[in-house]
């Protein structure tokens, strides 16, 4: 699905339209819809599949995305891929929030002070191991 960014993705402020494609229930791919030489193509992860994950969406983001009780909100975190997938890093402090009802999206920058259990370079393997231990 295509989304219009109402608040930019950090480092990609020049991109205002993106395409989100689900790979599976865990991973998705986000691509910038631009001809810029600084293209956007990143892997995202559903944080709720990895860990307990909860944060307050700031009021200004609620307003920008026109969120209400009928909105279908999707949240993803950026994955920095490594050669070995389990060595990849997840950024839980800058989630991407999408309202699929109206096609709006935004990145939210969370404070480490407010969310001390969230990291910006949490290794994916620490969550994979936990999942294996549950099995």
From Swiss-Prot:
| Keyword Transcription regulation belongs to the record | no
Q: Name one GO biological process term.
A: bacterial-type flagellum assembly
What GO CC annotations are associated with the protein?
cytoplasm
The entry's localization annotation reads: Cytoplasm
Question: Does the keyword Manganese belong to this entry?
Answer: no
Q: What is its main location?
A: cytoplasm
Keyword terms of this UniProt record = Bacterial flagellum biogenesis, Chaperone, Cytoplasm, Translation regulation
Query: According to its UniProt record, which protein family does this protein belong to?
Result: Belongs to the FliW family.
Recorded hits in HAMAP family, A to Z, give: FliW
Q: How does it assemble?
A: Interacts with translational regulator CsrA and flagellin(s).
According to its UniProt entry, the function of this protein is described as: Acts as an anti-CsrA protein, binds CsrA and prevents it from repressing translation of its target genes, one of which is flagellin. Binds to flagellin and participates in the assembly of the flagellum.
- Designated name of the protein: Flagellar assembly factor FliW 1
Q: Which organism is it from?
A: Helicobacter pylori (strain HPAG1)
């Amino acid at each position: 699905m295509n989304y219009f960014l109402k608040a930019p993705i950090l480092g990609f402020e020049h991109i205002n339209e993106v395409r989100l494609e689900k790979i599976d229930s865990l991973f998705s791919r986000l691509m910038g819809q631009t001809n810029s030489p600084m293209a956007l193509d990143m892997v995202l992860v559903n944080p709720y599949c990895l860990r307990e994950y909860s944060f307050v969406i700031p009021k200004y983001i609620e307003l920008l995305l026109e969120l209400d009780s009928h909105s279908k909100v999707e949240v993803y975190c950026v994955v920095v891929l490594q050669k070995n997938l389990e060595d990849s890093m997840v950024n839980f402090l800058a989630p991407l929030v999408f309202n699929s009802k109206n096609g709006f999206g935004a990145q939210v920058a969370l404070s480490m002070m407010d969310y001390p259990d969230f990291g910006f370079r949490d290794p994916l393997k620490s969550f994979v191991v936990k999942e294996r231990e549950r099995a």
